[in-house]
Each structure stands twice: as structure tokens, then as C-alpha cells.
Regions:
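C-terminal lobe/tail of nucleotide-utilizing enzymes
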Residues: 2-6, 225-305
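Walker A (P-loop) phosphate-binding motif
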Residues: 3-39
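Short, surface-exposed connector motifs at secondary-structure boundaries
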Residues: 37, 179, 203-206, 227-234
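Short beta-strand-centered segment that lines the nucleotide-binding/catalytic pocket of NTP-utilizing
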Residues: 40-42, 46-64, 137-143
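Switch II (G3) loop of P-loop NTPases
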Residues: 56-57, 156-161, 165, 170-195
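N-terminal glycine-rich dinucleotide-binding loop that anchors FAD/FMN and/or NAD(P) in oxidoreductases
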Residues: 68-86
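Cysteine-centered iron-sulfur cluster-binding motifs in ferredoxin-type domains/subunits
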Residues: 83-102, 112-132
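Inter-motif core of Ras-like GTPase G domains
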Residues: 194-213, 219
Length: 305
């Protein structure tokens, strides 16, 4: 288990994909439903109190469309941005030199700040020799908290329109991870910073892919990202076509030592259910057991889980 989560009972499982549209959110929500139903109707898992679904795709969260939670509260997310005192500032330019994000600049005899570029690190205020820079709060998004009919604790981060940095809202969303819960993180698509911010410090990452050349290419990028973060990962093949197959995908997984934990067939029934906003576990009860068995495999591969 990740060192930062020592003492936690339930694992944190991220669900990611190299690109959008692979079925990542369908898998994350279906797994959450299957596990939550097992907690309430099946034998209770030792020490685990509940299942959480955290939608960390903060630019465009949509897991709520499938789970239909009842939202209970909303928490604002803000970062600290610089405010420069014109009377104290000597225009030395040290703040602009140290800012890695070009969020502050000295232009002629004026200090200009660009709040939308600021990450809130505070280095400008720290290095100012005249103490001319103070910090003020700037709203960047919200975190919505709710609960589904199965008892899933639902956490959804959402950036304000026009914001450019997902990191602050993603981190705020992840602060609601509970150590006594099975926490499933729906990551944003791709392998850029927002995905890495979500997957980082997870106990395991499920990578959803498709049996196509593009799917394999994106999977390779996602695997490399997980390994750079030291997060173990397994593969879910969505839209699987057993009759046709795609040998390079299976060969890649074998060569890289990646377990293929689940295959979701390409059927009209699954596509129709998804288009109506239904998870696998709700639309097809027979899918609940394979999802739970997959979770059991994941648990076995997490040290001390």
C-alpha cells in the first residue's frame, strides 16, 4: 500500500485511460456500484465502511450522469494569488524572475499579475525583499459531495469556467478520500498533468483500453506514466471483439507483465445501456460478480492491503 496511506483499510484505485471515450467512467461507476451492493447485501469486508467514487475529471466531470447521486453540500476551492503594494514595491523584478509560471511580470514601472496562470505556490511573496507582496484568495472551482441510492459516497470536483489549471481542484477533491473506504478515482483522459495528479499516490490503477492500434498506443503511454509514478496497474479491454481479436494488444500485455483483469465485449446491449446512463452493474446484474472478482485480484496485488 502507498506509504502516504499507511494505516488505511480500504485501497485507493484510480481508473484511467490514454484517451477519452474508452469507457473509463463506465468502468469506474460500474465497479463502485458492484462493490457497494456487496457491502450492503453481502458479507461485510473487514474494516471497510463504504465505497467512494471521486470524479477527478474536474474539467468536465460526468460520473454523476451514471450514478445519479443526491448532492448534499458544496465546498469552494480557492488558491492564494499575489497582490502587490505599489507603495512598498521597488520594481526589483525578483518575483518575476522566480515565478516558473510567468504569473507575475515587471513591465516598465508597473508590476502586472496574471491570476489565471498562478498556481498559488507563494514563492513571489517569499522572495520579495520589501515584503511588498501579500496573498489573497481566488476561487478556482468547487467540490460537490453527495450519496447514491446504493450508499456510494460521491465526490465531484469541478473547475470554474475559464480556469486553466486543474491541479488545485483535483487536490481538493482527493482530500475527501477516506481511509476506511474503498476509494475509486475516475481520472481525466490522457496522460498529462491532470491524470498524473489523480493517479499519484493511488494503490493501483486500472487502465481502460480498446483492441485497436490507437488503443494500444495510448495504453503504452498510460503504462509508462503509471510506472513513472510507481503505481502498479492492470488492463481492462473495453469493446472487446473475441472473434476478431487484436493480437498485438495481448502480446504487449504479456511482454510488459500487465494482467488483463476484465474484458467487456462490444455489444449493442452494453452500448444502449450506457447511452441511457446506466452502469454495467445496474443494467446487467450478472456483471456484478466479475467486477467484484476483479477487485479481489487487485487487492491481492497491493502490498499490505
Amino acid at each position: 500500500m502507498n506509504a502516504s496511506r499507511q494505516g488505511a483499510v480500504g485501497p485507493t484505485i484510480a481508473v484511467a485511460a490514454g484517451k477519452g471515450g474508452t469507457g473509463k467512467t463506465l468502468l469506474a461507476t460500474s465497479l463502485a456500484v458492484a462493490l457497494a451492493e456487496n457491502l450492503t447485501s453481502g458479507p461485510a469486508r473487514r474494516g471497510v465502511s463504504t465505497v467512494q467514487l471521486l470524479d477527478c475529471d474536474v474539467e468536465e466531470p460526468n460520473a454523476d450522469l451514471l450514478l445519479q447521486p443526491r448532492f448534499i453540500s458544496r465546498r469552494p476551492v480557492s488558491i492564494m494569488v499575489p497582490q502587490v503594494s505599489k507603495t512598498l514595491c521597488t520594481l526589483c523584478g525578483l518575483c518575476a524572475q522566480k515565478c516558473q509560471f510567468s504569473a507575475i511580470a515587471v513591465i516598465r514601472e508597473v508590476v502586472v499579475t496574471f491570476p489565471e496562470l498562478c498556481c498559488g505556490c507563494g514563492v513571489c511573496a517569499h522572495v520579495c525583499p520589501e515584503r511588498a507582496i501579500s496573498e489573497v484568495q481566488r476561487p478556482v472551482g468547487v467540490v460537490d459531495l453527495g450519496r447514491t441510492e446504493e450508499g456510494i459516497e460521491f465526490v465531484q470536483g469541478r473547475m470554474n469556467v475559464g480556469e486553466q489549471r486543474a491541479g488545485p481542484v483535483t487536490r481538493a477533491t482527493k482530500r475527501f478520500i477516506e481511509p476506511q473506504a474503498i476509494s475509486i478515482l475516475d481520472a481525466p483522459p490522457g496522460t498529462a498533468c491532470p491524470m498524473q495528479e489523480t493517479v499519484e499516490e493511488s494503490d493501483y490503477c486500472l487502465l481502460v483500453t480498446e483492441p485497436t492500434p490507437f488503443g494500444l498506443s495510448d495504453l503504452n503511454a498510460a503504462v509508462e506514466t503509471c510506472r513513472s509514478l510507481h503505481v502498479p496497474c492492470g488492463v481492462i479491454v473495453n469493446r472487446d471483439r473475441p472473434q476478431e481479436g487484436y493480437q498485438p494488444l495481448d502480446e504487449y500485455c504479456r511482454a510488459e507483465g500487465l494482467p488483463v483483469l476484465l474484458r467487456i465485449p462490444e455489444t449493442r446491449e452494453v452500448a444502449e445501456a450506457y447511452s441511457r446512463g446506466r452502469t454495467l452493474a445496474r443494467a446487467f446484474p450478472e456483471w456484478a460478480q466479475p467486477l467484484r472478482e476483479m477487485y479481489g485480484q487487485i487487492k491481492k496485488s497491493i502490498p499490505s492491503a
